[in-house]
């Protein structure tokens, strides 16, 4: 499938939300980047900046999602090549075609909780935790249509370990692109809240 990427640019439109900090910034942007559908991307290593703030402190938003799979412990050299949203999408596509990730997740639903502490994925009864992604270890989040025609969307997380030596990709399925975009938006707000609270 042919894909054409567009360079992201700073914009004052309602479709772009950017937050700057001393060392990192968050960029949550919506743009037609792939599969002729909307891709929402949250990039915590961006160099963009503007001064929005929102101080919703301890709230946790919950979403029902399915777990597709993960590619863990990518070496630094491999992870560095996965900088943009299209890089992640293409990498996941190839991994699915190679059988490293399934195209369709198992039927079991999980609860994804997003807060200023990060992301927690737990069983639907919330007794068992499947994954925890600390906020400061999340490098990028991308959501996009899965291309299978059922209206489902994939949500991909790129994370690093505490020593920044390895990267991992985590892939979840959302019921719709709107749900996936909502998760990106909540995570952006969580970053915003933490960054705002760090200011003197």
Curated annotation (Swiss-Prot):
Locus of motif Nuclear localization signal: 6-7
Stated consequence of mutating residue 82 to Q: No effect on ITGB1 binding
Post-translational modification: Phosphorylation at Thr-38 seems to enhance integrin alpha5beta1-mediated cell adhesion. The degree of phosphorylation is regulated by integrin-dependent cell-matrix interaction.
UniProt-reported outcome of changing residue 86 to Q: No effect on ITGB1 binding
Biased composition regions of type Polar residues, renumbered to the chain: 34-56
Assembly, per entry: Interacts (via N-terminus and PTB domain) with ROCK1. Found in a complex, at least composed of ITGB1BP1, KRIT1 and RAP1A. Interacts (via C-terminal region) with ITGB1 (via C-terminal cytoplasmic tail); the interaction prevents talin TLN1 binding to ITGB1 and KRIT1 and ITGB1 compete for the same binding site. Interacts with KRIT1 (via N-terminal NPXY motif); the interaction induces the opening conformation of KRIT1 and KRIT1 and ITGB1 compete for the same binding site. Isoform 2 does not interact with ITGB1.
Protein name per its UniProtKB record: Integrin beta-1-binding protein 1
Classification of source organism: Eukaryota, Metazoa, Chordata, Craniata, Vertebrata
């Amino acid at each position: 499938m042919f894909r054409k990427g567009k360079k992201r640019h700073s914009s004052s439109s309602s479709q772009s939300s950017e937050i700057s900090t001393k060392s990192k910034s968050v960029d949550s942007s919506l743009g037609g980047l792939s599969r002729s559908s909307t891709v929402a991307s949250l990039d915590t290593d961006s160099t963009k900046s503007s001064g929005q703030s929102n101080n919703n402190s301890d709230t946790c938003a919950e979403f029902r999602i399915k777990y597709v799979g993960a590619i863990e412990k990518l070496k630094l050299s491999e992870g560095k090549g996965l900088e943009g949203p299209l890089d992640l999408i293409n990498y996941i596509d190839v991994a699915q075609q190679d059988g490293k990730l399934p195209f369709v997740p198992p039927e079991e639903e999980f609860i994804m909780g997003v807060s200023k502490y990060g992301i927690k994925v737990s069983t639907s009864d919330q007794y068992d935790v499947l994954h925890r992604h600390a906020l400061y270890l999340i490098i990028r989040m991308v959501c996009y249509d899965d291309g299978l025609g059922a209206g489902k969307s994939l949500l991909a997380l790129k994370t690093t370990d505490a020593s920044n030596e390895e990267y991992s990709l985590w892939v979840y399925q959302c019921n719709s692109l709107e749900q996936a975009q909502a998760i990106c938006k909540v995570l952006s707000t969580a970053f915003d809240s933490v960054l705002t609270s760090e200011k003197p």
